[in-house]
Design a protein with these regions (language model features):
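Short alpha-helical segments enriched in small residues
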Residues: 1-188
């Protein structure tokens, strides 16, 4: 379900990545693969796009992406810090320079005490650079998910535009002996 607006955003993002030798990864929950689909709909996406993890279930956020289990227990899966840890985890797990993550409630029912339209998008990049945005989106389930994709692409592009040129093409982790970003990565 691509729209001209997000399709153009994905193409522009990938052109910048290709020009600068940057790789990307995606972690998705509420968007369920839509963000990765937008990116891979662009011809040549494989030059920059490492892959995606669709961690729809809460235990996958912990076990695959390394989101802290106590954070999930205390705040639930729909939380800004969860989104940040998802982005950092997929960046580490897939060996990308930059990553973006989505989590939230598309509706029609509330989840984890959050109303439909509550969405968090986060980016993670080199040297600990990250940002999380809290969104209150309106519309149908499809409209909320599509808007979240657009917001994620916009946030990631803004960070890539602002990144120092010397950071291009740096793989994570900067130190290959570095531990996973969160202690729960790989715990069962």
């Amino acid at each position: 379900m691509t729209t001209q607006n997000t399709d153009g955003a994905a193409a522009g993002l990938l052109a910048l990545c290709d020009e600068r030798g940057i790789t990307l990864a995606v972690a998705e929950s509420l968007t369920g693969g839509l963000l990765a689909a937008e990116i891979t709909a662009v011809p040549g996406a494989s030059q920059a796009f490492r892959g995606a993890v669709i961690a729809y279930a809460t235990d996958l956020k912990r076990d695959v992406l390394g989101v802290d289990s106590s954070l999930l227990a205390q705040r639930g899966a729909v939380d800004g810090e969860v989104a940040r840890q998802m982005a950092a985890g997929v960046r580490w797990r897939l060996g990308a320079d930059w990553a973006v993550a989505t989590t939230g409630v598309a509706g029609p029912d509330p989840q984890d005490g959050q109303q439909p339209g509550t969405v968090f998008v986060a980016v993670a990049g080199p040297e600990g650079r990250s940002e999380t945005r809290s969104l209150n989106l309106t519309g149908s389930r499809t409209e909320i998910r599509t808007a979240a994709v657009g917001e994620a692409l916009t946030l990631l592009r803004r960070h890539l535009d602002a990144a120092p040129k010397g950071q291009d093409g740096r793989k994570y982790p900067e130190n290959p002996d570095q531990e996973a970003p969160y202690s729960s990565l790989g715990e069962r």
